[in-house]
């Protein structure tokens, strides 16, 4: 029998009676040196500082018939190496059982006196994670840290993305006599050093609640700069079929209303808002900050001149090109021939030019007209006031 045991912070006293009994009955005990050091003298089993599944399986094969215990820090079901051993044990027909332990998230929750059921759980320990995307999507995010990613490095990434005011809590050496809890903003914690055994909780209390496509027009900061209206934005996002990890371009971004919605629809991707007018660029910065669209990157300059160095897009919204539509399409399709494209137009001439440009490049052009009317009070009555009709032209491969 092989027993896989979560040892929490490494304290023998924190183990259940069943887990302690399994360790004491075992002939072989595997685990990291830190965990083996926590075993009491009455555990007389042969102790081996091994934790890689292949090494453990090889040793078990060399010692047939012996019961074994394998110790893991934290809980066996929470980003643990236990699953990496349990699968081959079952495949080999070796009997195995699991005793869970107390995870670091439970220890931090207890130390803070707060429940953790609403926290998003993310591991940055030995695996890639995007803290900016996670904190854009979730109000409270718990990070396991380790290796190259520390609480300070994660907070630095948040600060660099404009989320330096997010609240942070770092738990060090949880469940031990050296336990410490530190508080601060992401910007403050980014410049500090922490114990190797640390976890991070980030709380973004200013997370925008707007998520469905088509944010109200009045929610954006605007001036005289033209803005794509709510209903058109919602339709454009539907046409672009945005995926969470997409790389997106918004050419002729104006106030940034489309860019912001694209950014929040693709929190694990990047949005490049291309705009040449200084007043509009300032509005994009303000709306980016207001909506915490931290994955929105402003590209100041005229398209297509500034497009050459951008990464290949998965989808592109073209709201204005100042006569350079064909050159913009060439840049887009040169980087990704299968990019999803949506062009907005008011003038019939622009509509015709868009259809011709897409068709000439082997794309099928589909045109949707959006005519929006909104009510306006007139004394005791309400009248419908029409906005200018908008054309959305999408281009897809035949």
Mark where each language-model region is.
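S-adenosyl-L-methionine
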Residues: 276-313
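A contiguous loop/helix-start segment that scaffolds small-molecule binding in enzyme catalytic cores
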Residues: 2-6, 50-51, 65-68, 140-224, ...
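Conserved SAM-binding loop of SAM-dependent methyltransferases across substrates and taxa
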Residues: 255-267
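Class I S-adenosyl-L-methionine
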Residues: 1-102, 106, 268-271, 275-277, ...
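Conserved beta-strand signature within the Rossmann-like core of class I S-adenosyl-L-methionine
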Residues: 338-346, 350
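Class I SAM-dependent methyltransferase SAM-binding "motif I" and its flanking Rossmann-like core
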Residues: 11, 74-139, 300, 304-305, ...
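Conserved class I S-adenosyl-L-methionine
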Residues: 245-254
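Conserved S-adenosyl-L-methionine
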Residues: 264-271, 337
């Amino acid at each position: 029998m092989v027993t896989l045991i979560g040892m929490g912070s490494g304290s023998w006293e924190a183990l259940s009676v069943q887990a302690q009994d399994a360790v004491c009955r075992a002939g072989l005990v595997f685990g990291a040196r830190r965990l083996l050091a926590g075993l009491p003298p009455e555990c007389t089993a042969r102790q081996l500082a091994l934790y890689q599944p292949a090494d453990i399986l090889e040793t078990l094969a060399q010692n047939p018939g012996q019961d074994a215990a394998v110790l893991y820090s934290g809980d066996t079901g929470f980003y643990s190496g236990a699953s990496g051993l349990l699968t081959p044990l079952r495949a080999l027909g070796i009997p195995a059982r699991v005793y869970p332990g107390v995870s670091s998230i439970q220890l931090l929750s207890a130390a803070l006196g707060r429940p953790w059921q609403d926290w998003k759980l993310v591991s940055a320990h030995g695996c890639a994670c995007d803290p900016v995307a996670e904190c854009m999507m979730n109000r409270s995010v718990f990070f396991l840290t380790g290796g190259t990613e520390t609480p300070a490095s994660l907070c630095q990434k948040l600060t660099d993305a404009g989320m330096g005011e997010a609240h942070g809590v770092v738990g060090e050496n949880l469940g031990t006599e050296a336990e410490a809890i530190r508080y601060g903003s992401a910007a403050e914690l980014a410049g500090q050093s922490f114990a190797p055994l640390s976890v991070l909780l980030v709380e973004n209390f200013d997370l925008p609640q707007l998520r469905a496509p088509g944010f109200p027009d009045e929610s954006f900061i605007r001036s005289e700069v033209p803005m794509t209206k709510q209903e058109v934005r919602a339709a454009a996002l539907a046409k672009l079929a945005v995926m969470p990890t997409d790389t997106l371009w918004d050419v002729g971004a104006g106030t940034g209303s489309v860019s912001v919605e694209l950014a929040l629809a693709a929190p694990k991707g990047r949005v490049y808002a291309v705009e040449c007018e200084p007043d509009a660029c300032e509005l994009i910065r303000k709306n980016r900050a207001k909506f915490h669209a931290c994955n929105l990157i402003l590209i100041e300059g005229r398209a297509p001149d500034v497009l050459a160095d951008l990464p290949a897009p998965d989808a592109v919204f073209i709201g204005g090109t100042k006569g350079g539509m064909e050159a913009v399409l060439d840049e887009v399709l040169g980087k990704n021939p299968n990019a999803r494209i949506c062009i907005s137009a008011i003038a019939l001439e622009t509509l015709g030019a868009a259809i011709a440009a897409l068709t000439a490049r082997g794309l099928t052009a589909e045109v949707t007209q959006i005519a929006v009317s909104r009510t306006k009070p007139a004394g005791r009555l309400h009248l419908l006031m029409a906005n200018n009709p908008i054309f959305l032209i999408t281009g897809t491969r035949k």
